[in-house]
From Swiss-Prot:
This is Pyridoxine/pyridoxamine 5'-phosphate oxidase. Its cofactor is FMN. Belongs to the pyridoxamine 5'-phosphate oxidase family. Binds 1 FMN per subunit. It catalyses: pyridoxamine 5'-phosphate + O2 + H2O = pyridoxal 5'-phosphate + H2O2 + NH4(+); pyridoxine 5'-phosphate + O2 = pyridoxal 5'-phosphate + H2O2.
Length: 199
């Protein structure tokens, strides 16, 4: 891990901890932007579940729209917006390649989830057409009955993705739109640079 990458990661960790201790309702909420093979973009909000020097992890159905995008075009952009921080909010952008996390990591995280969240992962055919709410509730009841009295295992089609950063951008809001921006970026040889940008 290079010094500049370590610096960017430490900056994120400091801001993330600040957001977790602030008035933010859900500091871990992030927008994940993907694209399909045709280049059509898509974005949605998911929750960050872990981060370290290897990257930023979230979990989902692998056959969801984002899961399919990431398996066919393994690049993503993450966006955190913490409006309550500092003078006028902070925004962090992270861009990078994407990897599936190991089955062991996915199993460990799935086992830590509330039981009803585990059941929901089995009952939901994420991103597929649903005829009615009652149909979903019936699927939930069926899964509850199937696993009554025993642990709920992780579905084969559910797992984690790790975004491996190739760029970080930190935006510090200020009055009169006189913001401050810093960008950290890796080149093709994984050499990191840091520069200030006009707001």
């Amino acid at each position: 891990m290079t010094d500049l990458y370590a610096e960017a990661l430490a900056t994120f960790a400091t801001l993330y901890a600040e957001a977790q201790n602030s008035a933010e309702i859900e500091a871990s909420a992030m927008t994940v932007a993907t694209a399909n093979l045709d280049g059509r973009p898509s974005a949605r909000t998911v929750l960050l579940k872990a981060f370290d020097a290897r990257g930023f992890v979230f979990y989902t159905h692998l056959d969801s729209a984002k899961g399919r995008d990431l398996q066919t075009h393994p690049q993503a952009a993450l966006l955190f917006l913490w409006r309550s921080l500092r003078e006028a909010g902070i925004q962090v952008r992270i861009e990078g390649g994407v990897q599936l996390v190991s089955a062991d990591e996915s199993d460990a995280y799935f086992a830590s989830r509330p039981r009803m969240s585990q059941i929901g992962a089995w009952a939901s055919l994420q991103s597929q057409t649903l005829g009615s709410r009652e149909e979903f509730e019936a699927a939930i009841a069926k899964v509850e009955a199937t696993f009554d009295g025993r642990d709920v295992p992780r579905p084969d089609g559910w797992g984690g993705f790790r975004v491996v950063p190739q760029a970080f951008e930190f935006w510090y809001g200020a009055k009169f739109r006189l913001h401050e921006r810093w960008r950290y970026e890796a080149d093709a040889a994984s050499h990191w640079s840091k520069r200030m940008l006009y707001p």
